[in-house]
């Protein structure tokens, strides 16, 4: 996202994070600068807004590990709700468009069992874990406070991770299979995986189109985690017999997750012209 936005002449981009700059090479472009700021530090965030006076704020920060959030409620709420609320108030004060990233985990995963459909933006959230609950509450803060905003729900984002970033399912499968290691993947959880390049394109479209509301910015094909793994193995000509599909019960995850959280992109396709690629195309 930083790289793509910095490549456009009309944007001057400031990246800020609790951690050190993950893309220092962009510093040489003169279209990008990095400032180290903790989103939980209210005074520092206020000073940052005062110094930059941003036209657009894109919030990619979150405490996004469901198992960790389940046992660290206070920290999860502080980052995913309280800090988001502060950003929303500052965006309102500075008349900045606020683009806030959220997640498919705001849903309970039962819609397909009832209707056979994908989740649309109009369906009310019903999270099954604390991470999803905090992201839902963060969405509500943005919608209640801001007059110029977009909430971008994303899902299973994959692509080449930069140094310091945690990996993703595609890289995990590739690395394990290349090393000749077995990998267990869930065969009864469905997702709409999102290529990071398509996500970046969707965010840019949300900058240029000032429609308010929630948009699903994800892929347009619904796959199980096991199907994702097999597609990666087949394309890379790696040993697919090292992939062991298991059920959710067999995986014994400590935190509940939605079984089916495939999201519809028809709203984003119609209003934004968003047209993501399929996993096989990206590979």
What does each of the following model-derived ranges do?
Residues 16, 57-61, 98-104, 108, ...:
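SDR active-site strand-loop-helix element
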Residues 39-79, 92:
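NAD(P)H-binding glycine-rich loop region in Rossmannoid oxidoreductase-like domains
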Residues 78, 83-86, 106-107, 111-152, ...:
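Catalytic helix-loop patch of NAD(P)-dependent Rossmann-fold dehydrogenases
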Residues 140-191, 198:
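NAD(P)-dependent short-chain dehydrogenase/reductase
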Residues 202, 209-254, 259-260:
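Mid/C-terminal beta-alpha module of Rossmann-like enzyme folds, strongest
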Residues 256-283:
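C-terminal amphipathic/interface module of NAD(P)-dependent oxidoreductases
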């Amino acid at each position: 996202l930083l790289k793509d936005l910095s490549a456009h002449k009309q944007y001057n981009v400031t990246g800020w994070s609790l951690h050190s700059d993950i893309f220092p090479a962009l510093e040489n472009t003169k279209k990008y600068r990095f400032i180290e700021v903790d989103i939980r530090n209210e005074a520092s965030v206020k000073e940052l807004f005062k110094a930059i006076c941003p036209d657009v704020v894109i919030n990619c920060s979150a405490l996004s590990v469901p198992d960790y959030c389940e046992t660290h409620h206070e920290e999860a709420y502080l980052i995913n709700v309280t800090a988001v609320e502060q950003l929303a108030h500052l965006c309102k004060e500075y008349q900045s468009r606020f683009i806030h990233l959220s997640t498919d985990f705001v849903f309970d995963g039962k819609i397909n069992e009832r209707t056979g459909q994908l989740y649309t933006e109009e369906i009310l959230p019903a999270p099954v874990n604390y991470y999803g609950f905090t992201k839902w509450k963060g969405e509500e803060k943005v919608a209640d406070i801001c007059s110029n905003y977009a909430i971008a729900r994303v899902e299973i984002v994959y692509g080449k991770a930069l140094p310091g970033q945690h990996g993703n399912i595609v890289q995990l499968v590739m690395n394990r299979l290349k090393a000749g290691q077995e990998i267990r993947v869930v065969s009864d959880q469905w997702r709409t995986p999102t290529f990071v390049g398509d996500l970046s394109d969707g965010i840019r479209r949300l900058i240029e189109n000032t429609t308010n509301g929630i948009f699903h910015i994800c892929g347009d094909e619904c796959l199980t985690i096991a199907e994702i793994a097999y597609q990666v193995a087949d394309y890379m000509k790696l040993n697919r017999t090292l992939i062991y599909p298991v059920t959710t019960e067999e995986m014994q995850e400590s935190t509940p997750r939605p079984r089916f959280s495939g999201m519809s992109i028809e709203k984003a396709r119609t209003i934004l012209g968003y047209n993501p690629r399929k996993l096989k195309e990206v590979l």
